C-alpha cells in the first residue's frame, strides 16, 4: 500500500530514470541549430576533436550530448532520418550499460548507432551482436554510410571468414556479428599457438540486439569446439531397432492404466525413465542380440556406455518429434529447430549422444560423437565485456533475471507515438479442430475487409497443418518457418499488403519490420538504376495502399497457442501497432494445447468442457489468470534451471580463466626456462618424497626404487647407492640437492647440444601442447562428474558443494600433471634441430584448425535441469484408491475415514 502511494507521488524507478535522461535530451536538442550550420567537413572533424578531448582527460559522459547531436545531424544528412527524442533516450540507456526495451518499429537499429559511435571514440572497439548472419550483414551495410561519414570503420563478423579478414574486422571501430561467432572466436583464440593467430581485441563494449533471445533463451546453450571421439555408429543402429519393441506405461490415474509398461514419460521435465519391467525386458533383448553377457545387468560398470545408448535412443523416439524438434534436410542431415524462434540451427547438435540416436531413428548417416576441446556458455562469455548493454521489444517480464545474472537494469523506453493496438481477450475451444475452424473464419473476415493477417504457430508441424486447412478454404497465404528460411525477408516485405495472410512459426522473421501496405524499398530494389520519378511513383502508390490498410484496421495478429513464456507471446503481439499504427491481436486456444493440457488442473478442465457445446468458445478472466499463472510457473522453473546451470558453469569458468591466463602468459613469453626450472625442482622433490619419506630413517629409504624411477621417467641414470656408500655424511637434504643439481647439469648439456634458442622454443611448445591435452581431458572429466553429481543428494550431501569440491581436486590434479608431464617429456625427448620443433608446431596447428572447424553451439539437453533426486516425489506402485471407496484393509469403512487419514 505504502509502496504504491510512494510510486504515485515520486514515480516508479523507470519514471525517475526517464526524467533524468529527458534533461540530457534537452541539452542535445540545444546543440541542434549550431550543428545544422556546420559544413560536412566540420561535422566530420568532430570525431577527431572528440578523440583529442578524451586524450586530454574528458570522459564519455561529458562528451555524450555533443556526440549524440553529431550522430543525429550526420544521420539527417546521410539517411534523411532524424533520431526521435525517445531514440536519444534509448541510446543513453545503452551507453549506461543497461537494457533498453523498445517496441517493434521504434528504430532499434538507428538507436544503437548513438551508443556505438560514442563508445567507439576511445578506439577500443564496439561489438554489436545480432541473432543471425543476415541481420549482422544487413545492419552493417545499412549503417556503414553513417559511420564512414563520421570517420569510423565498420566490420562484419560472420562464420567461415578467412583468418586475415576476421583479424581485420576486429580492428574496426564498430563490428557487427552473431553471438555464436563472437563466442567461438574467443574459444579459437584460446586454442591458438602464436599471438599472431589470435583475432580478438580486449572485450570493451557490446550492444546485444534481441538481448532476451541471446542472454535468456540461449543461456542454456554452451558453445563447444569439439573433435571426433571413437566411432560407435553401429551400436546406435543396433539399439535403435530395439526401442520400437518397448511400450509406454500409462499414467496411474488414466482409465487405460496398466502397470506393466516398459518406460514412463514426464512431459514437464522432458524426461523418460525405464520401469523395472522395462529394464528386465531391455536386458533380455540385449542378451538375445549379443550386446550383453547372459546374467549381466544394464547397471554394471562395464555396461555404462550401453545404458547411455539405450537412454539416448529412448529419448530420441519418445520425446523428440520430426518437424517439431528437428527437421531432416533433403541431403539427410538432422537439423535442430529452435523451440523459441522456430528457426533451424544448422551446425548445432544435441549432446550426450542424443543427436546420433535421432540420426539412427531417421535412418540417416550417423556423425561421430564429439569430444569437447573448449567450451563456454553465453552467460559467461558476455560477462567478459567491460560494459554490456542490450535492446529488445520485450525484456520487462525477465527484468529480474537480467538483474540477477548479468547485473543489467531494464529501462522501458516510451513509444514515439501512443500505441493504439486492440489486444482482445483469449478465446478457448474444446478441441484443436474447433479452434482451427474459428481461426479460419476470423482470417476469412479479415481478408474480405482487406486487412493483413499474421498467424503465429508454435511449431513447423502446426504451421503446415494450418497451411493445409487454409488451402482447403481457398485462402492464399505465405508460410514463414525454418524450412523456408531463405525467403524470409521477401515474405516479411509482403506481409503488410491488403488481405495478405502470413503464417509464422514462433518468431521466424524477427528483426524485420512488417510495414503496412508492404515494403516500397523492396519494389525499388527490384529495378535496375531506378530514376527519382520511378521512386516517387512507387512511394505514392505505397502511401495509397498504406492508408487503405490503416482504414481496414491495420495488421491483425492471431496466436494459435500460448507459448510457455509470456515474453514470446508479447513478441508476436508486438509485430502489430508499430509507430502508432492501428492493429489488433487475439489468441485462440483449445483444451488440447500443450500448456493447457499440462498445467490446467483436471477439475478446471472438466468444469470448462462440461458447459461447452461443439464449436462454442469461452472467454473468461479466471481462465486467462490461470494461463498466466501457468506461464509464470514455467518461466520460474526455466529461470531456476538457467541459474543452476550458471552456478555449475561458474566453477568451470574460474578454472577456464586460470588456464587461459596461463596460456596467454606462455604464448607471449619468449623464455619460460625459469618456470621449467621451478617445475623440475617441484616434480623431482615429489618423486623423492615417495622413496625417501621426509625426516625418515635411512632404513626406510627405497634407493633402488628411486634409481629405477629417475632412469625410467626422467632419463637420469644416477648411482645414488654408490654415493651413499662412499659418503657416510650424505644426509637427506644434501642428497636431494645433489640429485637436482645432476638433473640440471644433464639438461644443460642437452641444451648446449642443440642451442639455447631451439630449447626455449621446444619448452614453450611442449608446455602448450601438454596444457591443451590435459585441459581437454579435464573438460571430459568435468562432464562425467556433472552428469552423476545429483545422485549425491541421496547421501544427504549438497550436490553443488560436492561438485565444487571434486572439480577443485580434479583441477589440482591437472596442474600437478602439467608439471610432471612437461618435465618427463623434456627429460626424455632428444631434440636434434629447430626443424623438428617447427614440424611439431605445424602438426599441432593443423589439428587445432581442424578442431576449430568443428565449432558448434550444443544444446544443453534436458538433463541440465539437474534435478536433486533426493527431493523427487515418491512413486506409488499400486492402484490409487478413491477417497470414498471401501478401504483395501477390509475394515468396511470408507478409505478417507480409515487408512486414508494416515496417508
From Swiss-Prot:
- Residue stretches of biased makeup (Basic and acidic residues): 840-853
Q: Which GO terms describe its cellular component?
A: cell envelope Sec protein transport complex; cytoplasm; plasma membrane
- Details of cofactor binding: May bind 1 zinc ion per subunit.
A Gene Ontology BP annotation from the UniProt entry: protein import
Cofactor dependence is on: Zn(2+)
**Binding of Zn(2+): at which residues?**
887, 889, 898-899
Residues binding ATP are 87, 105-109, 513
Q: Which superkingdom heads the taxonomic lineage of this protein's source?
A: Bacteria
Catalyzed reaction equations: ATP + H2O + cellular proteinSide 1 = ADP + phosphate + cellular proteinSide 2
The Enzyme Commission number assigned here is 7.4.2.8
The Swiss-Prot or TrEMBL record annotates one GO molecular function as:
ATP binding
| Keywords, alphabetical | ATP-binding, Cell inner membrane, Cell membrane, Cytoplasm, Membrane, Metal-binding, Nucleotide-binding, Protein transport, Translocase, Translocation, Transport, Zinc
Q: Where in the cell is it found?
A: Cell inner membrane; Cytoplasm
Q: Where is this region: Disordered?
A: 840-903
Entry membrane topology = Peripheral membrane protein
The subunit structure is: Monomer and homodimer. Part of the essential Sec protein translocation apparatus which comprises SecA, SecYEG and auxiliary proteins SecDF-YajC and YidC.
Family, according to the entry, reads as follows: Belongs to the SecA family.
Free-text function comment from the UniProt entry: Part of the Sec protein translocase complex. Interacts with the SecYEG preprotein conducting channel. Has a central role in coupling the hydrolysis of ATP to the transfer of proteins into and across the cell membrane, serving both as a receptor for the preprotein-SecB complex and as an ATP-driven molecular motor driving the stepwise translocation of polypeptide chains across the membrane.
Q: What is this protein called?
A: Protein translocase subunit SecA
